[in-house]
Amino acid sequence: LIANEQVPEGDKLPSLIKMDQVLNSNSPLTAIKSISYGQSMLAVRLAQARGYTDGVYLNQNGDVVETGSANIVILKNEKFITPSLESGCLPGITRQILIKHFGISEELFSWDEMLESDAVFLCSSIRLLIPVSKVEGKLFEKNPLGEKLIGDLNQIIRSKIEL
């Protein structure tokens, strides 16, 4: 089952902050989605307490992993990139669709590389793909390539749903 929310506008778009807690990409629990959402809720609550909507986890090597509620996609030099599974991220359904159908690249990248990117997006089964408005102090404008990818993803999802 895939759900889809409307893309929020302006200041309702997600904003991200770096979490102090580090994820261990070598943990045997890495990439296992469980019914325990404690760590995910921690990221969201700590971020909200600081005026952001979600927190970004890094692994022990300083690589971006994911947020408390979604996988991450960045756009850098007209190339969409999501953290590789080696980072310790969950192999989310929407992430897998983006890789399979849109050629999104899987690579390791740092917090600084994310800040230097042209755009940042969150992807999840609930939101599909949504642009991020701010990562700590850096504001991100809407990006035409990102808007096209969002539209194309929504179209492919709708084409697979039988009513």
Predicted regions and their residues:
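Helix-start/capping segments and mature chain N-termini
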Residues: 1-163
